[in-house]
């Protein structure tokens, strides 16, 4: 399954980028139903599902995606990482998916795809994950959104073990101020994996985030977020304890 899915991702990205090159040579992207997007971010701590991926140090992140009007998309996202060992220092994740609006009154948006966690200098950590997301807008207040996600892999962190991740994220704008709020809660369950550092054999944990966002009106696409991020992982030793307990994370993000 892993090899097949990886080939599918590679072929999909190649196909989309090839189309992009042809379109650039002959006409604009929009005439081919294609659109390009990207982002760059600087964060004080790369927290993945509540757990630091940089030993609580800052991270520079970014990515790009090509989307087609049919709903198909493919892209790559990257960040520096530090797991406390010599390698890896870079995470580079290709992904491919399909998003569509469902024909219901609330017009929820379904997004399904494959995400490959790649570590070029430590390929033993590489693993593939399947995801499905369902998004709703104007749930409680005008302009808000609720996103529910389910993720599954049979090769968690390259260990050939099953793992599930469930998450719900809610965002809401504060009137027309540019400020907003964000809150999320997630649950991870991994077979034969101990997230504690004291032999508690905790194969599951809960993560959370509560924060405030700000969109800079004078600079389109520029936003900032200050959030409290943490988990209920039972940890005693540093620096692992610091990297899983609740802490403040500031992120500056620019989309284009």
Regions found by a protein language model. Name each.
Residues 1-35:
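Cleavable N-terminal export/targeting peptides
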Residues 23-35, 71, 86, 101-109, ...:
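Short loop/turn motifs that connect adjacent beta-strands in outer-membrane beta-barrel proteins
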Residues 24-82:
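Short glycine/proline- and aromatic-enriched beta-strand/turn motifs that initiate or cap beta-hairpins
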Residues 32-34, 56-60, 88-92, 108, ...:
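Residues that define the transmembrane beta-barrel architecture of outer-membrane proteins
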Residues 36-40, 62, 72-76, 94, ...:
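Transmembrane beta-strands of outer-membrane beta-barrel proteins
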């Amino acid at each position: 399954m892993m090899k097949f899915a990886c080939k599918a991702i590679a072929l999909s990205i190649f196909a989309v980028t090839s189309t992009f090159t042809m379109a650039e040579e002959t006409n604009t992207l929009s005439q081919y139903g294609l659109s390009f997007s990207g982002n760059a971010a600087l964060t004080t701590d790369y927290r993945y599902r509540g757990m630091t991926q940089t030993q609580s140090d800052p991270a520079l992140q970014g990515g790009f995606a090509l989307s087609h009007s049919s709903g198909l998309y493919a892209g790559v996202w990257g960040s520096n990482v530090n797991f406390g060992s010599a390698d890896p220092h870079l995470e580079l994740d290709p992904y491919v998916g399909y998003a569509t609006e469902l024909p219901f009154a609330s017009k929820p948006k379904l997004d399904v795809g494959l995400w490959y966690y790649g570590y070029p200098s430590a390929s033993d950590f590489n693993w593939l994950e399947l995801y499905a997301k369902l998004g709703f807008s104007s749930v409680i207040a005008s302009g808000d959104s609720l996103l529910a996600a389910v993720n599954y892999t049979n090769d968690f962190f390259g260990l050939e073990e099953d793992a599930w991740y469930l998450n719900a994220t809610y965002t809401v704008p504060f009137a027309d101020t540019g400020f907003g709020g964000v809150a999320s809660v997630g649950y991870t369950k991994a077979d034969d994996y101990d997230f504690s550092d004291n032999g508690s054999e905790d194969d599951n944990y809960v993560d959370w985030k509560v924060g405030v966002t700000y969109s800079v009106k004078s600079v389109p696409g520029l936003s900032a977020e200050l959030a409290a991020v943490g988990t209920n992982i039972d940890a005693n030793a540093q620096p692992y304890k610091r990297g899983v307990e609740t802490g403040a994370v500031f992120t500056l993000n620019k989309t284009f």
